[in-house]
From Swiss-Prot:
Disulfide bonds: none annotated. This is Biosynthetic peptidoglycan transglycosylase. PANTHER family: BIOSYNTHETIC PEPTIDOGLYCAN TRANSGLYCOSYLASE, MONOFUNCTIONAL BIOSYNTHETIC PEPTIDOGLYCAN TRANSGLYCOSYLASE. The lineage of its organism: Bacteria, Pseudomonadati, Pseudomonadota, Betaproteobacteria, Burkholderiales. Pathway: Cell wall biogenesis; peptidoglycan biosynthesis.
Length: 240
């Protein structure tokens, strides 16, 4: 008589191992995609970013008559005034840091812990670019961790000038307005290469809340903060 062979079924531990392996492979594939995309963008200009696509879709639902404004220009076609203003306002140590400002991250961590939720991120220019290129607006520690990984990739594969060039051409400056050239035409009827120091300072101050300042251009805070940034611009170090 032939003995019946029992087929063992995977137990819960084995299923957990399988699930962990699938998650790990998916995570590695995602990182490989990001890495490969950044490698390509070191030589090819990105036509859009994750933020631009999601933002323009949302705007198309709320304001279908709104036209998107975005024109890519080379790094040399952007006023040094604007470059200095943004560095003075957003990331004074941009040229010398490795994409992170540890003190700012720790300060943001303490504020977030006190609030019980993520309200600040302590982001450098490179971190902002990482977020705009690939990530959602969701605020979570998982997303922040992914942002730090992408930041490392950007700093590893690109020099500071290329990082700044992509940032300047993709950052949001109002409702449907992306990049320095579009912002210069939208607010001042000029090109990015001809922006004055005063105009550049105002544009730099708008960056954390571009939609708000698009609709509140007479804001007293905007005017006062722009004067502060204008005074700091002379000390801003550029990556060129």
């Amino acid at each position: 008589m032939t003995a019946t062979r029992r087929v063992s079924r995977p137990g819960p531990v084995r299923w957990m191992v399988y699930l962990g392996a699938v998650v790990a492979i998916a995570w590695l594939a995602t990182q490989a995609f990001y890495f490969g995309q950044i490698a390509v963008w070191n030589y090819v200009n990105p036509q859009s970013t994750s933020f631009m696509r999601s933002d323009t879709w949302r705007l198309s639902q709320d304001r279908p008559d709104l036209s998107v404004q975005h024109t890519w220009v080379s790094y040399d076609q952007i006023s040094r005034n604007l470059k200095r203003a943004i560095i003075a306002s957003e990331d004074a140590n941009f040229v010398n840091n490795n994409g992170y400002e540890t003190d700012a991250i720790l300060q943001a961590w303490e504020r977030n812990k006190a609030k019980g939720k993520i309200v600040r991120g302590g982001s450098t220019i490179t971190q902002q670019l990482a977020r705009n290129l690939f990530l959602s607006r969701e605020k979570s520690y998982i997303r922040k961790g992914q942002e730090l990984i992408i930041t490392w990739m950007l700093e590893t594969l690109m020099d500071k000038e290329r990082i700044f060039e992509i940032y300047l051409n993709s950052v949001e400056w109002g409702n449907g307005v992306y990049g320095a050239e579009a912002a210069a035409h939208y607010y001042y009827k000029t090109s990015a290469s001809k922006l004055t120091a005063a105009q550049s300072a105002r544009l730099a101050v708008m960056l954390p809340q571009p939609k708000y300042f698009d609709e509140h251009r007479g804001s007293q805070y905007l005017a006062q903060r722009a004067r502060v940034i204008a005074r700091r611009m002379g000390a801003a170090e550029l990556p060129d």
